[in-house]
């Protein structure tokens, strides 16, 4: 019977031990806490909307004003689009022409559009505000996985009906969009507070 030299046995044992140690340190598959992408938001700076419409307001310098190109759009409907944030504030305006029936229809439509979100909303909070320009506005904050998180409308009940609603062109969950929602909401309040009718 042949015996291996003692040194060779020791080397074999060391290699066997190292291999076993390497196998025993399996990767850790512990779930990591949920994280969100970092979003750097610019400071709030504003510019006035041009005088091509029967209203004016201040909007963010980070946004572009685009005409609404949908087939239902009226001439003074706009989109205030934030390209870096994939956010869009849809603006609809209707001259109610001292027409009580048209005014009532616009009020009903505004409530229906907000109400459509009840299926996914965990809460819809309505506040009535008075702007520095003396306008009364209904403001809606929606929570949950809703397509529109913030909306408002204001009217003088005789001629002007103005509505704005925030939408995102992304499938990202609203909880991860929270800083961006707050950022654009701040801009929308500035829009509302600076809103004036000019025709």
Predicted regions and their residues:
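Bacterial N-terminal signal peptides that target proteins for export
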Residues: 1-12
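Post-signal peptide N-terminal segment of mature Sec-exported envelope proteins
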Residues: 31-52
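Secretory pathway targeting signatures of secreted, lumenal, and periplasmic proteins
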Residues: 53-108
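Bacterial signal peptide processing site
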Residues: 24-27
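Solvent-exposed, polar/charged alpha-helical surfaces in well-ordered, non-transmembrane soluble domains
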Residues: 57, 61, 108, 112, ...
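C-terminal motif of bacterial Sec signal peptides marking the signal peptidase cleavage site
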Residues: 19-22
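Short secondary-structure junctions
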Residues: 61-70, 115-128
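Short, well-structured beta-strand
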Residues: 29, 122-199
């Amino acid at each position: 019977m042949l015996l291996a030299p003692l040194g060779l046995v020791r080397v074999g044992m060391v290699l066997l031990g190292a291999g076993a140690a390497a196998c025993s340190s399996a990767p850790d598959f512990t779930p990591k806490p949920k994280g969100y992408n970092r979003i750097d938001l610019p400071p709030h700076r504003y510019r006035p909307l041009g005088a091509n419409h029967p209203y004016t307001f201040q909007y963010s310098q980070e946004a572009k004003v685009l005409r609404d190109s949908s087939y239902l759009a009226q001439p003074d409907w706009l989109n205030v689009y934030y390209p870096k944030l994939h956010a869009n504030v849809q603006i609809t305006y209707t001259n109610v022409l001292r027409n009580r029936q048209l005014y009532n229809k616009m009020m009903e439509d505004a409530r229906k559009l907000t109400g459509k979100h009840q299926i996914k909303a965990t809460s819809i909070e309505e506040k009535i505000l008075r702007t520095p320009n003396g306008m009364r506005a209904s403001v809606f904050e929606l929570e949950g996985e809703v397509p529109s998180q913030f909306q408002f409308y204001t009217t003088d009940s005789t001629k002007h009906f103005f509505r704005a609603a925030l939408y995102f062109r992304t499938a990202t969950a609203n909880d991860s969009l929270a800083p961006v929602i707050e950022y654009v909401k701040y801009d929308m309040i500035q829009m509302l507070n600076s809103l004036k009718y000019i025709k």
